[in-house]
UniProtKB/Swiss-Prot annotation:
Catalyzed chemical reaction(s): trans-aconitate + S-adenosyl-L-methionine = (E)-3-(methoxycarbonyl)pent-2-enedioate + S-adenosyl-L-homocysteine
Function recorded in the entry: Catalyzes the S-adenosylmethionine monomethyl esterification of trans-aconitate.
Protein name: Trans-aconitate 2-methyltransferase
Enzyme class: transferase
Gene: tam
Superkingdom of origin organism: Bacteria
Organism, scientific name: Paracidovorax citrulli (strain AAC00-1) (Acidovorax citrulli)
Length: 260
């Protein structure tokens, strides 16, 4: 998959940052010395951490060089490291008080081992806070798979849906963490985002979920694929009374705290 596009991602920054705010609001820490943003993207969520914990060492982790460059420009006082969450671990003696993963772990596989490993990396009393989109069965994502299965695109796209991991059920995450945590808080929210048009919905998902489908296509095939996808979106999201479309966006939240 090609590198991420920070400018495209930021076009819907308010909508993307809202769940980051709501995740952070449930983090039961009054202070922290070291906080880590796993999958920091362009730094919108990292900025929330820096404001919430002034004076803390703030570290952002991401695989994307473009996203990290954008984050460094936004937050020059923070530390940003290019690394894969699947292999990342804190340095000895640098266990974080907060591991914060907003809309990133859905791109990392092996949650049955990943989640307990991240939790074990926390300092005593530390918190693991996770938010993940739970929208694979929404029309926005079903339509991606349906169009990708059609000729002439299916051979080039292949199994693009496999790039994003199949997340577990919310009760499964509770079961992973409850035996080892002091407390576990889980909840599920479906946001309803008013969107100006079907094209606006396509633009939103082009910055994230649609990338694995579009990137493998030859340049000559991309416009046709996107046009077919937009027709599917137009049919799936009817115009509401004010002329807008409502994009339902389910998200899962997990906040677990270690014993002191």
């Amino acid at each position: 998959m090609h590198d991420w596009n920070p400018a495209l991602y930021r076009r819907f920054e308010d909508e993307r940052t809202r769940p980051a705010h709501e995740l952070l609001a449930r983090v039961p820490l009054s202070a922290a010395s070291h906080v880590v943003d796993l999958g920091c993207g362009p730094g919108n969520s990292t900025e929330l951490l820096a404001v919430r914990f002034p004076g803390a060492r703030v570290t952002g982790i991401d695989t994307s060089a473009a996203m990290l460059q954008s984050a460094r420009e936004r937050l020059p006082a923070a530390e940003f490291v290019q690394a894969d969450i699947a292999a990342w671990a804190p340095q000895p003696g640098e266990a974080p008080d907060l591991l914060y993963a907003n809309a990133s772990l859905q791109w990392v596989g092996g949650h049955e081992s990943l989640i307990p490993r991240l939790f074990a990396a926390l300092a005593p009393g530390g918190v693991l806070a996770i938010q993940m989109p739970d929208n694979r069965q929404e029309p926005s994502h079903r339509t991606m798979r349906e169009v990708a299965a059609q000729a002439p695109w299916r051979d080039a796209i292949g199994d693009a849906a496999a790039v994003r991991t199949r997340i577990l059920g919310i009760a499964d995450y509770y079961d992973l963490l409850a035996p080892i945590a002091r407390s576990v808080d889980v909840w599920h929210t479906v946001y309803q985002h008013p969107m100006a048009s079907a094209a606006a919905i396509v633009e939103w998902v082009s910055g994230t979920g649609l990338k694995p489908f579009v990137d493998p296509l030859p340049e000559a095939q991309r416009a046709g694929f996107l046009a077919a996808y937009e027709r599917g979106i137009d049919a799936a999201y009817p115009v509401r009374a004010d002329g807008q479309r409502l994009l339902a966006f389910p998200r899962m939240f997990i906040v677990a705290r270690r014993s002191a």
